[in-house]
A protein has these predicted regions:
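Membrane-interfacial helix-loop-helix connectors in multipass membrane proteins
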Residues: 55-59, 86, 160-188, 237-240
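Membrane-embedded or membrane-proximal helical elements that form or frame transporter/channel pores
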Residues: 48-107
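Transmembrane helix boundary and interhelical loop/hinge segments in multi-pass membrane proteins
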Residues: 17, 108-127
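A structural motif at transmembrane helix-loop-helix junctions in multipass membrane proteins
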Residues: 19-25, 115, 174-223
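Hydrophobic alpha-helical transmembrane segments of multi-pass membrane transport/permease proteins
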Residues: 4, 19-52, 71, 95-108, ...
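Junction motif at the cytosolic side of a transmembrane helix
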Residues: 208, 254-276
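Short, membrane-interfacial amphipathic segments enriched in basic
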Residues: 1-11
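Selective transmembrane-helix segments that form parts of the transport pathway or gating/packing helices
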Residues: 103, 108, 135-162
Length: 276
């Protein structure tokens, strides 16, 4: 393994991401919306309305919970939480948990699409093929160039979200309650796996399309399972709890390994050369 060559490709790809506004904006906007804007809007806005007396949310029956969550889900997730804190805890612990997975997924897929399909569209793929690296090293470099930023953004966002969650919920909860074991598993077990799976899918997709736009359009379908998880949880079909999240992470890692093995075939020089 020629590590200097691997890191040279990683640095080149990261520099391209920083220069490319079309890639840079989604990397910033997605975590800000999910991990900052939504908590402030849903929890901060609810606390403000409650304190002003405009909307009573001190009981589950008078809160927005009945309109967004299945009663069985409420019983399983927040039955032990004081009534005044149920809305805040539900939003921060339950509702936003599946959406958090969109952060590493979007970051990984956006960078991967630019790294693979973008190289072909910009006409820089041919030069890359002439670098003194083996196919395995090229695959590793491309993987690290997207996976490392994805988990960095996911973990930095998790840290910011943890502080923000405790600040927003303090008026009703009255203590530091976050992060929970479920969220720790999401951040450090599932998020890296989701990033790897997104990368594997984008490698497969990018090997079969010629434009960055096409890669984005097809690759965007990978967010659908996350949306289905959110709907299933709100419907009471499942609840993100430690054992389920641990098992889900294992499944995602297995799928990611399979996708990356399939995608590795798309990065062989002879196949890339035929698609220039």
């Amino acid at each position: 393994m020629t590590w200097p060559a691997v890191w040279a490709i990683v640095r080149k790809d990261l520099a391209s991401v920083i220069r490319n506004r079309g890639v840079r904006i989604p990397l910033l906007v997605t975590p800000i919306i999910i991990l900052v804007f939504l908590p402030v809007l849903l929890v901060g806005g609810g606390e403000l309305l409650a304190s002003s007396g405009t909307v009573p949310i001190d009981a589950v029956g008078a809160s927005p919970l009945d309109r967004v969550a299945d009663p069985q889900l409420q019983e399983r997730a927040i039955s032990a939480v004081p009534p005044a804190a149920r809305w805040a805890v539900f939003v921060l612990e339950v509702f936003l948990a599946p959406l958090y997975l969109l952060v590493p997924l979007v970051v990984a897929t956006v960078i991967a699409a630019d790294s693979f399909a973008g190289e072909r569209e910009r006409g820089t793929l041919e030069a890359l093929l002439h670098t003194p690296t083996r196919d395995r090293e090229l695959m590793l470099a491309k993987f690290l160039a997207a996976w490392l930023p994805a988990i960095t953004v996911a973990w930095a966002g998790f840290l910011v979200y943890s502080v923000l969650a405790n600040v927003l919920a303090w008026p009703s909860v009255g203590r530091v309650f976050f992060p929970t074991p479920t969220w720790l598993l999401l951040a450090f077990w599932v998020a890296p796996a989701v990033s790897a799976l997104g990368l594997g899918v984008m490698v497969i997709v990018s090997g079969r399309v010629r434009t960055l736009q096409a890669a984005h359009q097809i690759g965007s379908l990978i967010v659908l399972p996350v949306v289905l998880l959110l709907v299933a949880q709100l419907g009471g079909v499942l609840l993100f709890e430690p054992r389920l999240v641990a098992a889900m992470g294992l499944l995602v890692w297995l799928l990611a390994t399979l996708a990356l093995r399939i995608g590795a075939g798309s990065l062989r020089r002879e196949r890339l050369a035929t698609r220039l």
